[in-house]
Amino acid sequence: MSAFGGPGGGQINQKPIPPQRGSFPLDHDGECKHVMTSYLACMKKVRGVNDNECREFAKSYLACRMDHNLMARDEFKNLGFQDVKDSSNKGDPAKKGELRW
């Protein structure tokens, strides 16, 4: 039996769910374009790896959007930017070629 024409085969109406953080306006005036292009160039340079340098560009981009009222102001820790501290590198810094446990 076909689901298209059979009884009870009508579409189920579901209420659309809004995005978690709401919607925000696009940057039509290019107020943060310079930061965005720097971020995209960084991502291209590191071939898509989540590099700390690129994360700083992303953080700057979000700060620019918040400064120009293109998104709601929020703390960076809520946007996924937390102070990343590697627990394996405690104490003095490692020397090149040194194996650390």
Curated annotation (Swiss-Prot):
GO biological process entries: mitochondrial cytochrome c oxidase assembly
Species per Swiss-Prot/TrEMBL record: Pyricularia oryzae (strain Y34) (Rice blast fungus)
Keywords: Cytoplasm, Disulfide bond, Mitochondrion
Source taxon at top rank: Eukaryota
Compositional bias annotation for Gly residues: 1-11
GO CC terms of this entry: mitochondrial intermembrane space
S-S bonds: 32-64, 42-54
PANTHER family attached to this UniProt entry: CYTOCHROME C OXIDASE ASSEMBLY PROTEIN COX19 (PTHR21107:SF2)
Chain residue ranges for the region called Disordered: 1-28, 81-101
Keyword rRNA processing: no
Function per UniProt: Required for the assembly of mitochondrial cytochrome c oxidase.
Localization: Cytoplasm; Mitochondrion intermembrane space
Motif extent (Cx9C motif 1): 32-42
Protein name: Cytochrome c oxidase assembly protein COX19
Keyword Cytoplasm: yes
Motif window: Cx9C motif 2: 54-64
GN (gene name): COX19
Family of this protein: Belongs to the COX19 family.
Start and end residues of each CHCH domain: 29-72
